[in-house]
């Protein structure tokens, strides 16, 4: 009887250990599942716009930290207002010498000029003079005189931008010419963010850089992402339709985003390089679905 009692006790202890082990592993699985089901969400401000992120994965915090640092670097290189930026230095040196730039800047300017050629100049990276003249979206927005506009238009010319790949430098040949990468830099930044997320093993994320949206993978439940396309004639949040996508960039540009009104006429921020005035193409909004956000950004602006 004593022998049987000892065996029973041993069996009970083994059984209890097995049960506790199962409970322990189930608890770990549950905690991990909960972590996976709730994204890291953050809203920031950079590149002149509001940024929003939803990231799932155990490396989400580290990935977001690196992504924000990368965005900051891009902004530092391509700002038109920061005296330390490449673009600022190129602009103030227009009519003078070549200016050495970071490889990020050189790549984006090269892509911008490529899209200028492909669009026959409707996408125009040397439009900086017009942007500075109108100042739409700032407290100093204004309606320039016809003479001011004509002068700014005369300085536009993507064909004139000189690129020296060997020395990674850029030159604007005429004094007063100005680059502005506002129509393409956010797209480049979005692509760089997605590359960082992938390197960190992130499988599911939504990146929104002020309307430049990139959805990585699918949602955590394996369904496609739903990306709404804003109705330009309705208040924000009213959609023309919803795109169901994965691993895609969705970029929308519209004349409803930044504008001012004077004497009953609306002046928006998308310019026609040929006239110097806000474009009157008849299009209120353009949405581009693409594999790379830099492409969608440029095409939606053109």
What are these regions (language model features)?
Residues 1-302:
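Mature catalytic core of soluble alpha/beta enzymes
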């Amino acid at each position: 009887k004593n022998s049987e009692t000892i065996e029973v006790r041993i069996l009970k202890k083994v059984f209890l250990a097995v049960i506790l082990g199962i409970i322990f592993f189930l608890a770990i699985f549950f905690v991990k599942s909960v972590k996976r089901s709730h994204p890291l969400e953050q809203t920031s401000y950079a590149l002149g716009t509001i940024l929003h992120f939803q990231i799932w994965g155990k490396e989400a915090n580290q990935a977001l930290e690196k992504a924000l640092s990368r965005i900051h670097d891009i902004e530092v290189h391509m700002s038109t207002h920061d005296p330390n930026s490449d673009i600022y230095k190129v602009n103030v040196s227009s009519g003078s010498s070549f200016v050495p730039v970071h490889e990020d800047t050189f790549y984006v300017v090269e892509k911008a000029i490529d899209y200028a050629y492909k669009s026959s100049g409707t996408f125009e990276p040397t439009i900086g003079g017009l942007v500075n003249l109108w100042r739409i979206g700032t407290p100093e927005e204004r309606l320039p005189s016809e003479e001011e506009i004509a002068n700014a238009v005369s300085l536009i010319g993507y064909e004139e931008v000189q690129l020296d790949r060997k020395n990674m430098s850029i030159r604007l040949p005429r004094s007063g010419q100005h680059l502005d990468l506002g129509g393409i830099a956010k797209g480049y930044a979005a692509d760089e963010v997605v590359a960082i997320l992938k390197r960190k093993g992130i499988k599911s994320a939504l990146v929104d850089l002020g309307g430049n949206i990139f959805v990585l993978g699918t949602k955590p439940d394996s369904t496609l992402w739903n990306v709404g396309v804003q109705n330009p004639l309705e208040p924000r949040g009213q959609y023309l339709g919803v795109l169901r996508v994965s691993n895609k960039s969705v970029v929308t540009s519209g004349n409803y985003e930044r504008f001012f009104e004077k004497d009953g006429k609306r002046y928006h921020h998308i310019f026609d390089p040929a006239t110097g005035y806000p474009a009157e193409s008849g299009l209120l909004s353009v949405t581009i679905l693409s594999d790379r956000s830099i492409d969608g950004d440029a095409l939606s602006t053109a």
